Regions:
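Helix-adjacent hinge/juxtasegments
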Residues: 65-68, 74-92
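Anion-coordinating catalytic cores for phosphoryl-, nucleotidyl-, and glycosidic chemistry
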Residues: 10, 19, 62-65, 75-77
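Short Pro/Gly-enriched beta-strand edge/turn motifs at strand-loop
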Residues: 12-13, 24-29, 126-127
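Short acidic (Asp/Glu) patches
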Residues: 56-61, 76-84, 126-131
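Charged, gly/pro-rich active-site loop segments
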Residues: 1-9, 83-142
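Extreme N-terminal tail/first-helix region
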Residues: 1-23
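Short beta-strand segments
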Residues: 25-59, 75-76
């Protein structure tokens, strides 16, 4: 993967700042190489555990088909966007991550990531979280 340097160095975050932005976000846009090489982007909830970003979806679908063909992805998170009308601009707090996607097959890791994802979406009681995991985990891909 060839990484181009940012044009606006004054707006580039450190790796630690980028991780902090990822940690406070709840959704982003996953971009994959779709049919015929066309880009396909879809908004998704996510969670971060360690150095990994986990996304969840159904067991089958277009994005999983695309990832099976070409695992190169881009994930973009925007946590703030402030329009500055006087300067005809917008100030963003965002992170763009390039990487390779893979389906999580280890059940323990899958359940931990799904539990973490539930936690990022708000205050959920342990009982509701357990009910959700029992009911939906088997139909969820991470």
């Amino acid at each position: 993967m060839t990484e181009r340097p940012m044009r606006r160095k004054d707006r580039q975050f450190s790796a630690a700042d980028a991780r902090a932005i990822l940690a406070k976000g709840t959704h982003g846009v996953l971009s994959v190489v779709g049919d015929g090489g066309w880009p396909y982007a879809v908004p998704m909830n996510y969670t971060v555990m360690g150095t990994q970003i986990y996304l969840h979806c159904a067991r089958a679908g277009y994005k999983l088909d695309a990832i099976a063909r070409d695992d190169r992805v881009c994930f973009t998170v925007v946590t703030q966007a402030q329009v500055i009308p006087a300067h005809i601009t917008t100030l963003y707090e965002s992170v763009v991550v390039l990487g390779r996607a893979q389906v999580v097959t280890a059940e323990e890791e899958r359940l931990a990531a799904l539990g973490s994802l539930i936690d990022t979406l708000g205050d959920v009681t342990p009982e509701i979280k357990a009910q959700y995991l029992a009911k939906k985990a088997k139909n969820t891909t991470l």
